[in-house]
Every structure is written in structure tokens, then in C-alpha cells.
């Protein structure tokens, strides 16, 4: 039987990493599965893995962005130089390890999950290997992506995008005559929470994600601040950690939101679920998304979702008016207004919460498994 190998950057917390673990748990029901993780991060795997899934790590060295930034901010030239050298060493080591690993695999199915690794698989992958490349983000018409699609993906058997729209776009950039097939396979939920009484949810908005610029949590704070005068009894909880934490803490203070906004830090999957079950609304203000896993989780917990309608992502999940609201990207006043409409209408919010839970079932493992079967076999 063919072995499925999945190449991951790491298995710590993150939407891509959760999707990888979910895929492995699905595939291992029918195939031998191995996850090849470039980095061996602390507390990884962060998400449950079937005991039959093998995990192999390529490097002991880990990325050192946190230490590098600390040295830069602290104006410590010796530490900065040391961390810069270490960063280059880690980067070069990663590139060598990925290329060596892809060259070493001569049978079965190999799935890469990052654009730069997809290019290596296309170029160096053994013809006897069934080569599948996943793209987990919106390419945003970035020239690096477009050039890769046009000139670097022809050696792949299948390219997996997360939405039909992204698949249509990428399909037109793959050269005519190439064997490469482009398909759409969404993320899926392995687990559905135990029912929580919708009537007992608190006057709380929740948002989850890495505290990095592309998640746009600064935009969420601006929007939430506009609701405070009319709804001082509502709170906002942002779950996650990351490089923007200090900036967000400063912004919370500047906006006078210290008594209403909590940055919880990173929580376990069970902790995230508990936050979602107790909240009444989910808020997303990302600058870009691929197929937001976190929106599926929010729907499954009975959370109507309010999101900026960025190019792709939220629109692939949210059904406007039924289980959420899409707001023109960047329109703070409109976003705050939509939040307040739902804050003020308990009956509508509860109906949307029920619809959200029903919609989440469309992304069960059983429903997506059939799509994957058409991808895994020639």
C-alpha cells in the first residue's frame, strides 16, 4: 500500500498545522502516513494525532525571530550579530534539508504544504512519486506566486487550493499541456463541540489567531472601540500570541479599552473551544486569508461571524445574513455598525448561532474525505 508523506514546516500552533494534523488523521484510516516536520518545536505536535501517524523531524535548530528582534530592539550589537548568523544558519539548513528529503523519496504520495516547497517538489520530485502541492494562503497576485504557478508547478501531479475561486485562478496560470491538475479541497473539522446552551452565552466577542500584522487585530480594536459608548457591557477577548502583542497592548491603552479587552495569550485547543462556546460573536479583521480554519471552529461553537470581506477566505465560509456578516474591507464604521446590530438583537443572534452550527456540519471529515480520495489516486 502506498505511504502518504506530508512535509510540514513545524507542528506547533497554527491553522496550517492543524489542517496538516487533520489530514494525517484522515489518511491514516486507509494508508500508512508519515509527517515530515522540518523543525522540532517545543510542545509539538500541538494538535491530536492518531497513534498510527509517524512523525519525523529534520532539524533540531529552530527559527530565532524572537531572539533576533529582542537583540535589535535592545540595541545589543553582539547579540544581534550572533542571532543574525544563527538565523542564516537555520534558513540554509532548512533549504538543504527540504531538498535532500524530497530527493530521497522514491515511491508513494508526497504532499508539500508551502509554496517554496511546492516548487522544490515540482523540480526535484521523483517521477515515481505522486506529487501533491497544497497552497494554504491567498496568492494576492504576488509575482513570486504567479511566476511559480506559471513556470514552477508543471512537474506536480495535483495542486490543491482551499476554495473553488482560487483553484480557477491558479488553473489558468498553469501552462497548457502540463499534466498538473488543480482542484479545490476545503479544510474540515475533525471534532464538533459538546452542545452549549446558546441562551447562556455571554456578552462577549472573541477573535483567535497569531498576533501578527496580517491578522489585523489593530483594526478590530478600532472597530470595537466604536461600539463602547452604546454597549459598555460587552467585552472582547483576543486569543493568541505573537510579535504584535506589545503594539496591541499599547493600542488598547490608547483607546481606553483596558477594562473591556483581554489578550489571553496562546491557549490549548480545548481552551480556545471554551472561549468560543462562551462568546456570542466571532470577529475577523484579517488583511488576507486563505480558508480560515478558525471560522469553521467558530461556526461549530454557534458563533455568528462578522468579517471584513477580503479577497478570499471569509466569503468562502460565511453565508451572509444566515450565519454571519461580510463587511467591505477597511470600513470601520460599517463593521462597528454590524457588530452593534447583532449585539442589540438577541433573537437574530440566536437564530444565526443555530444556522452556524448546522453549516459547520458541511465541513465534517466524512464529507471532505470523498474529495481527497479523488486527489490521492492517479
Which ranges hold each PLM region?
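A conserved mid-protein helix/loop that constitutes part of the nucleotide-sugar donor-binding site
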Residues: 14-22, 203, 207-229, 236, ...
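Donor nucleotide-sugar binding/catalytic pocket of nucleotide-sugar-dependent glycosyltransferases
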Residues: 132-140, 154-194
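Nucleotide-activated donor-binding/catalytic signature segment of Leloir-type glycosyltransferases, i.e.
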Residues: 249-267
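Short alpha-helical donor nucleotide-sugar binding micro-motif in glycosyltransferases
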Residues: 266-267, 274-279
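Aromatic "clamp/platform" in nucleotide-sugar-dependent glycosyltransferases that forms part
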Residues: 287
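Short hydrophobic beta-strand element within catalytic cores of glycosyltransferases
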Residues: 304-308
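Conserved acidic donor-binding segment of nucleotide-sugar-dependent glycosyltransferases
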Residues: 320-321, 325-332, 341-346
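A short, well-ordered alpha-helix in the C-terminal region of glycosyltransferases
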Residues: 334, 341, 348-362, 370-374
Amino acid at each position: 500500500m502506498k505511504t502518504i508523506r506530508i512535509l510540514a514546516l513545524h507542528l506547533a500552533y497554527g491553522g496550517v498545522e492543524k489542517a496538516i494534523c487533520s489530514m494525517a488523521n484522515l489518511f491514516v484510516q486507509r494508508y500508512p502516513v508519515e509527517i515530515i516536520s522540518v523543525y522540532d518545536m517545543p510542545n509539538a505536535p500541538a494538535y491530536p494525532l492518531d497513534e498510527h501517524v509517524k512523525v519525523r523531524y529534520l532539524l533540531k535548530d529552530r527559527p530565532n525571530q524572537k531572539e533576533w528582534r529582542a537583540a535589535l530592539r535592545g540595541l545589543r550589537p553582539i547579540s544581534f550579530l550572533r542571532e543574525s548568523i544563527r538565523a542564516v544558519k537555520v534558513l540554509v539548513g532548512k533549504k538543504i534539508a527540504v531538498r535532500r528529503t524530497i530527493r530521497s523519496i522514491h515511491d508513494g504520495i508526497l504532499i508539500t504544504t508551502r509554496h517554496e516547497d511546492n516548487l522544490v517538489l515540482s523540480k526535484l520530485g521523483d517521477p515515481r512519486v505522486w506529487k501533491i502541492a497544497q497552497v494554504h494562503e491567498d496568492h494576492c497576485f504576488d509575482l513570486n506566486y504567479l511566476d511559480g504557478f506559471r513556470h514552477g508547478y508543471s512537474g506536480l501531479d495535483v495542486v490543491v487550493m482551499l476554495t473553488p475561486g482560487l483553484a480557477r485562478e491558479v488553473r489558468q496560470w498553469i501552462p497548457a499541456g502540463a499534466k498538473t491538475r488543480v482542484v479545490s479541497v476545503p479544510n474540515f473539522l475533525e471534532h464538533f463541540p459538546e452542545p452549549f446552551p446558546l441562551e447562556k452565552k455571554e456578552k462577549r466577542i472573541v477573535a483567535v489567531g497569531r498576533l501578527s500584522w496580517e491578522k489585523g487585530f489593530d483594526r478590530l480594536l478600532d472597530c470595537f472601540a466604536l461600539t463602547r459608548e452604546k454597549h459598555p457591557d460587552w467585552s472582547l477577548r483576543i486569543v493568541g500570541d505573537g510579535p504584535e502583542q506589545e503594539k496591541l497592548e499599547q493600542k488598547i491603552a490608547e483607546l481606553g479599552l483596558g477594562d473591556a479587552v483581554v489578550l489571553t495569550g496562546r491557549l490549548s485547543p480545548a481552551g480556545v473551544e471554551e472561549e468560543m462556546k462562551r462568546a456570542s460573536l466571532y470577529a475577523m479583521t484579517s488583511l488576507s486569508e486563505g480558508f480560515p480554519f478558525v471560522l469553521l471552529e467558530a461556526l461549530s461553537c454557534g458563533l455568528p461571524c462578522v468579517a471584513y470581506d477580503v479577497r478570499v477566505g471569509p466569503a468562502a465560509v460565511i453565508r451572509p445574513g444566515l450565519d454571519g456578516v461580510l463587511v467591505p474591507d477597511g470600513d470601520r464604521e460599517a463593521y462597528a455598525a454590524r457588530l452593534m446590530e447583532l449585539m442589540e438583537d438577541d433573537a437574530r443572534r440566536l437564530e444565526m448561532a443555530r444556522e452556524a452550527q448546522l453549516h459547520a456540519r458541511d465541513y465534517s471529515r466524512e464529507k471532505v474525505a470523498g474529495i481527497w480520495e479523488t486527489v490521492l489516486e492517479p
